[in-house]
Amino acid sequence: DAGLSAGEVTRALGGYDRAIGFGDNGAVGIGGITLGGGVGFLHRRFGLTLDNVLAVEVVTAAGDVVYADDHSNADLFWAVRGGGGNFGVVTRIKYALQPLSTVVGGMMMLRATPARLASFVQAAVDAPDELCGIIAVLPAPPMPNVPPELYGQPLIFALMAYAGTEDDAARALAPLRGVGGVVADGIRPLRYAEIFEHGGPPPMPAVSVRSFYMDEFDDVAAGTTMHLLEESSAPMHAVQFRVLGGAVARVARDETAFVHRDRRIMGVAVAAFSDVHQAPEHDAWTDDVTWSLRQG
């Protein structure tokens, strides 16, 4: 059922020691995640969410219910994997399940400097395919595990997951931990479903989000990122980086409608706020981040 949430499906599959790599938010519906791509905590190991789709059921604009896979309505099957909901309403999705019950994961927090941010992102790029995560830099909000004296200071929040053994995870994570400035390190063995239960500040009623792609992230890009953070007046704002590559890049660029196979980093600018009348101001900031950092 395409209306289920990522968290619901992940918890159900965990009872069978199986997993599907969805995005990074358990509250989001699996339909949107799947049709748009699906970058989360397993994509470098098992591919994007859409790479694990075996078949879909689609209601077309004419009201017809159509089954599509590699052999039946193959053009439609190609288009919905990466083309979003532009080709009909996807009501059911058949996935390949991956044998996975636990990961080594959790949140790391580090004091942010341009050099440290650049080194951390590069270490994630160089890491084994089993390691995925979200690397976000933002002014630290009041939340658990953040010392009060760091509220408002720029921190790197890295929510990471390693799909492998604890010993292998320790080796893979060593370069990330080695960049220094670690404030908190909550990475530990856990059930895969637990990675979606990470805490955070309460949501706000309005949000501006823009995404972009990069192939390199050096000290200059990191410095630009840190400067841009100072330019936002939103109560909550961040720039996030998700490393691609691995299994994502091993699928041919024309095999699905997802066209960013060869990109190395996906960036996201986020501004969350309460006053909807301020949307143009915060949209301008997320646009500025996008145009300042995007490559190609």
Predicted feature residues:
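Soluble FAD-dependent oxygen oxidases
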Residues: 1-296
